[in-house]
């Protein structure tokens, strides 16, 4: 069986116009996959050079396959049908290492056709490293590497206004474009680079903030033999992902035509502010996950898929989304409902086994950031506590007992919460404190909740009622009235 390469698998080769910092699975099944579609269906005509930003030989360089690899996109489509689509990606030309090919890295800036820079260097990637110097070959941090590359371009083209770049980071931090721009400007200042360079950075370059959304499951280790037999070739860089994807870019409207998004309907939005889209994702996708986990797990289920195939648990989650979360969000209702419908479809994806316990990690912080804002907004708007979001808090407190049907399970959170819950549940078990006192002890931790939740009208009472119902009747019976 042949390994993928351009000699044995000839096809389109595109001129290099895109630099991509990051060789990982996510960008390959998200950015490079979209570029490949645009190359095929429009005149975008843009090849990608991947820059490996870290000092590592693993995984091997994509150049061993001449940049070729296969994506397998699978999940439920818009009609709710299970689909699996294999695509040979030709958008990547080569991969270089910034550590072993530094001159080659700088040379990328000399190409007059280079226009876009994408990146995913992990959440920690857009950060400041005080020791980074201009002459380092290379600097440690991604922003410092980018500053050096931008200065190379500025110098090579004598500050030409039409040689700036559109920089589109995909790291999972708020306003990632603004954060990256600030660090590039900081390095320019600390390295005492000319004022003209700073002017050119500001005037000729666009730093766009983004929201990215797709579950990328990566190399399908357990299925690789069957998949390669089906494909008819060996591919050491197979990359699997869910059917759903969303790319929101906060940038100039002209970006739509420059990326040829006006010629192919992709799920990419060019917007003035990503904030409402971020809030939508956190509230609906992440919020539904966080409400679902303690309820479904204590109802005897182990994966998100099992939970969505359980009529009662599914009804609980869908009612939480449509009746309690969507009404308090600030985007058009039809947009929110369409997104919510996609979310529940993603939860049902038969190709992804999403363990509830793995999503349960740091549940206390997740509840505060993902659900509490909607609970408080709902109470403010209607004068009543949203029943399911409140019940989810009681279920979360019950989850921290760490025991289901007499068997213990691992609970992962900050140590102070683990210690606090261990003590509270032991005291409750020994009848030293009542359920109401336990609830008050959790809701009054202002340094966590950023307020004293015992002051929220009716919250202690309702969480206590819900928690007592869970403890006395079991999760199935307790949640039934809300399904």
From Swiss-Prot:
Reactions performed catalytically: D-altronate + NAD(+) = keto-D-tagaturonate + NADH + H(+)
Metabolic or biological pathway, per its Swiss-Prot or TrEMBL entry: Carbohydrate metabolism; pentose and glucuronate interconversion
Q: Where does NAD(+) bind?
A: 18-29
Q: List the disulfide bonds.
A: none
Belongs to which family? Belongs to the mannitol dehydrogenase family. UxaB subfamily.
Cite the PANTHER family for this sequence.
ALTRONATE OXIDOREDUCTASE-RELATED, MANNITOL-1-PHOSPHATE 5-DEHYDROGENASE
What protein name is recorded for this chain?
Altronate oxidoreductase
Q: Organism, per UniProt? A: Enterobacter sp. (strain 638)
């Amino acid at each position: 069986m042949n390994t993928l390469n351009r000699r044995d698998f000839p096809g389109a080769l595109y001129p290099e116009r895109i630099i991509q910092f990051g060789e990982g699975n996510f960008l390959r099944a998200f950015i490079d996959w979209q570029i490949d579609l645009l190359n095929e269906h429009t005149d975008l005509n843009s090849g990608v050079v991947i820059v490996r930003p870290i000092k590592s030989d693993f995984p091997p360089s994509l150049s061993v396959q001449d940049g070729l690899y296969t994506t397998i996109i699978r999940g439920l489509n818009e009609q709710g049908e299970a689909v699996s689509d294999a695509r040979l990606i030709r958008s990547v030309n080569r991969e270089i290492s910034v550590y072993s090919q530094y001159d080659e890295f700088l040379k990328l800036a000399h190409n007059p056709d280079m226009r876009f820079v994408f990146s995913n260097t992990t959440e920690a990637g857009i950060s400041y490293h005080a020791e980074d110097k201009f002459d380092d070959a290379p600097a440690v941090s991604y922003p410092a590497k980018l500053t050096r590359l931008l200065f190379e371009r500025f110098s090579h083209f004598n500050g030409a206004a039409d040689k700036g770049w559109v920089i589109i980071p995909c790291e999972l931090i708020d306003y990632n474009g603004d954060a990256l721009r600030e660090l590039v400007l900081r390095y320019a200042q600390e390295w005492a680079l000319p004022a003209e360079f700073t002017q050119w950075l500001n005037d000729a370059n666009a730093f766009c903030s983004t929201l990215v959304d797709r579950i990328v499951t990566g190399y399908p280790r357990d299925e690789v033999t069957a998949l390669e037999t089906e494909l008819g070739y060996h591919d050491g860089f197979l990359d699997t992902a869910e059917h759903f994807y969303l790319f929101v870019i906060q940038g100039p409207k002209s970006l739509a035509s420059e990326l040829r998004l006006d010629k192919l309907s992709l799920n990419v939005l060019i917007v003035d502010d990503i904030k409402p889209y971020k809030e939508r994702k956190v509230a609906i996708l992440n919020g539904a996950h966080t409400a679902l986990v303690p309820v479904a797990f204590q109802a005897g289920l182990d994966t998100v898929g099992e939970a969505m195939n359980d009529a009662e648990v599914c009804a609980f989650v869908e009612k939480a989304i449509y009746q309690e979360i969507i009404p308090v969000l600030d985007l058009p209702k039809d947009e929110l409902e369409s997104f919510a419908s996609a979310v529940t479809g993603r939860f049902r994806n038969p190709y992804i086994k999403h363990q509830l316990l793995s999503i349960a990690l740091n549940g206390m912080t997740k509840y505060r950031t993902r659900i509490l804002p909607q609970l408080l907004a709902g109470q403010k708007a209607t004068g009543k506590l949203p029943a399911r979001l409140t019940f989810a808090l009681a279920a979360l407190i019950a989850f921290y007992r760490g025991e289901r049907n007499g068997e213990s399970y691992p609970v992962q959170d900050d140590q102070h919460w683990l210690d606090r819950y261990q003590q509270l549940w032991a005291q409750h078990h020994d009848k030293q404190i009542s359920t109401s006192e336990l609830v008050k002890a959790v809701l009054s931790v202002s340094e966590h909740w950023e307020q004293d939740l015992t002051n929220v009208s009716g919250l202690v009472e309702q969480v206590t009622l819900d928690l007592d119902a869970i403890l006395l009747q079991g999760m199935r019976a307790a949640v039934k009235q809300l399904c």
